[in-house]
């Protein structure tokens, strides 16, 4: 099974296993580390937050299904955890949910903020998302608008 197919199937399984528990997939990594592949699953639970027991439940169920379906093309390690406090922002719904929070965005290419300063990293308060563009009030005082298709990586930042 191709890498894309593995990711799609694991995503489907997590949705099936997690939905009854109120658990959602935040991110999924399937990549080579050393000689083996790693399936790294990041989960969240909107009501009450994700805990160790939730992760263990999903891990056991996912592992059992992966063993039965046996579609993984090579040896792998399964890791299931919360996304942590610097949670990635992957979907439009993530940006909508975390309006007003401090975020860090890295782009594929240099982009200008409203003052004309070019950069690839934007840190500030998420002020909005519309028409595929996120608005950020930068920590330096400027504003920026970053198209989602230019975002290489985005995550929440811890506020002290």
From Swiss-Prot:
One of its GO terms (cellular component) is cytosol. PANTHER family: RIBOSOME MATURATION FACTOR RIMP (PTHR33867:SF1). CDD domains: YlxS_C (cd01734). Keywords: Cytoplasm, Ribosome biogenesis. HAMAP family: RimP (MF_01077). It is found in: Cytoplasm. Belongs to the RimP family. Gene3D superfamilies: Ribosome maturation factor RimP, C-terminal domain (2.30.30.180), RimP-like superfamily, N-terminal (3.30.300.70). This is Ribosome maturation factor RimP. The keyword Cytoplasm applies. Pfam families: DUF150_C, RimP_N. Required for maturation of 30S ribosomal subunits. It comes from the Bacteria. It comes from Citrifermentans bemidjiense (strain ATCC BAA-1014 / DSM 16622 / JCM 12645 / Bem) (Geobacter bemidjiensis). The keyword Transmembrane helix does not apply. One of its GO terms (biological process) is ribosomal small subunit assembly.
């Amino acid at each position: 099974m191709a890498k894309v197919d593995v990711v799609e199937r694991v995503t489907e399984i997590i949705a099936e296993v997690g939905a009854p528990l109120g658990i959602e997939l935040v991110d999924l990594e399937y990549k080579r580390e050393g000689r083996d592949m790693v399936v790294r699953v990041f989960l969240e639970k909107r009501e009450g937050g994700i805990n160790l027991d939730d992760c263990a439940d999903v891990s056991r169920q996912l592992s059992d299904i992966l063993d039965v379906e046996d579609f993984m093309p090579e040896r792998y390690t399964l890791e299931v955890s919360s996304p942590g406090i610097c949670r990635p922002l992957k979907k439009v719904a993530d940006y909508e949910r975390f309006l007003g929070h401090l975020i860090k965005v890295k782009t594929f290419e240099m982009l200008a903020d409203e003052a004309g300063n070019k950069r690839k990293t934007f840190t500030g308060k998420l002020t909005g998302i519309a028409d595929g563009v996120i608005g950020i009030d930068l920590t330096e005082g400027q504003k920026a608008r970053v198209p989602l298709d230019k975002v290489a990586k985005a995550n929440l930042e811890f506020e002290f």
